[in-house]
Amino acid sequence: RKIMVNLTIDGRQISVEENTTIMEAARSVGIQIPSLCYLKGINEIGACRVCVVELEGKDRLITACNNICEEGMVIYTNSPKVRKDRRTTVELILSEHDCQCVTCMRSGNCSLQKIANDLDILELPFHQYLEHQPWDKTFPLIRDSAKCIKCMRCVQVCDKVQGLGVWDVEGTGYHTTVNVSGHNSIREADCALCGQCITHCPVGALRERSDTNEVWKAIEDPDKIVVAQVAPAVRAAWGEELGLAPEDATVGKIIDALKRMGINYVFDTTFSADLTIMEEGNEFVKRFTSGELKDRPMFTSCCPGWVRFIKSQFPHLVKYLSSAKSPQQMFGAVMKTYFAEKLGVSPEKIYTVSVMPCVAKKAEREMDLYYEEYAGHDIDAVITTRELIRMIRSAHISPQTLVDVESDRPMHEGTGAGVIFGATGGVMEAALRSAYYIIKGENPPAEAFTAVRSQGFNENDGVQEANFQINDITVRTAVVSGLGNTRGLIRKIESGEVHYDFVEVMACPGGCVGGGGQPIHDGEERAFERGKNLYYLDRNANLRFSHENPDVIQMYKEYFEAPMSHKAHMLLHTEHKKNM
């Protein structure tokens, strides 16, 4: 039986369950107490003190985010005393914050900017002091110390959710600040580039390196043929900031926008996701049936945040990664060989652009192991979903005027199996659909492997386990998202507590749909809802098995001969080195 607590907030008598915070109680009746540092279950430290309220009978104001409701409390969230204190607190925060909003990527989507406007703060009464720490601007993740408000969100998310501890507090008193742990440079840190610190920062102190100018230069270069790909997870989120409903924010409209910008050819990454499944699925069947996976499972390799993580934290397990490149890199390799030959041009003329939900993809593009086969990198530029939105706006494209345009040929088709790559469990499900076919010679029911789908991203420590029987073979699988959850799972594998044959890992909670390059909604976690959108698209797709993609089949006939062939190994696989 639930125990209820009765209290009064701003004259309203309410009843809430015990252990409810004052902030949660207020929100339950539509009273939005402002906050900057609060993240439910992650950062409840009352550091910013913007959420202070007045408790009748007490002189000192208390923070609403981490004080529990008690029987008979009388709370005032907007008394003169509260308003004066909150305003002074925000003015002090602004005195240590670079307020050049017009040059900040978060302008218009900044919690501090909104609170300052709501409090009618039009000038700063305090002398401004800004901290300037050096930063490597070539790194895919950028930190601007002058914008940091010391809310500690990045510290807590990296530590509690991702288990990496890249960020830490240094200094004391007035000189307290946040920096890379251990006085290291960011390149020396074990940063996986998941970007969760970016999406949980309430201001613009953390962002991705912008590569939009490089893309515009390529578009303007008459000697370049610009070819773009759009990742599955992007279609689930790009419309959020552009006023488009999920059902209207189609991949066809992204293709239209990119073509209007001047990009010559646009493809859907679901094609190369299907190609990845053909290679990775066949690789798994080969390694599994040969007995190679008796001691350790084969791990998926399409998430670069996870690949960076295993290289820095568990380098002895790198050999168990699938050798298949990610869909992004396979796409680039195919564009600069197969597609270049189709066009009759040299690979150097092709400029490949990836639109990704991910910051780590920017680093994956730059890794040495991806440009040994021919001149240049597989991928020339990576932009996040947020960068795509900025490019659409800067090109003066009205989202409401966009129409559905089909992707170009010959890499035109994509299957539902490729679409669900963007959600946790999607790669595993797609791989099992085709592995079943490889082993049995017939398709399984399309819904046969839904047990690997996450029911909610806070259950089972972020791990989904499932065993599947294919003929006389039992395949033991696990799916995990979030690097903190991943570390826990690997420790169990290492100790012998659990045994699997195939493990899918996604660095971001919920998978790519919750990626570090996706639109930011402060205080909201939208990965699960975005993931449901991708599963809907899969359910309604004409093709649901990667091995049935006619354009993939045709490419093997014309170019690669068969999955795992010598040519496929040269272009679609890689040797994972232990260094980042």
Provide a role label for each language-model segment.
Residues 9-12, 56-57:
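Short strand-turn-strand beta-turns centered on an Asx-Gly dipeptide
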Residues 18-78, 82, 209-580:
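Iron-sulfur-associated redox domains of electron-transfer enzymes in respiratory
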Residues 49-193, 206-221, 225:
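Fe-S ferredoxin-like electron-transfer domains
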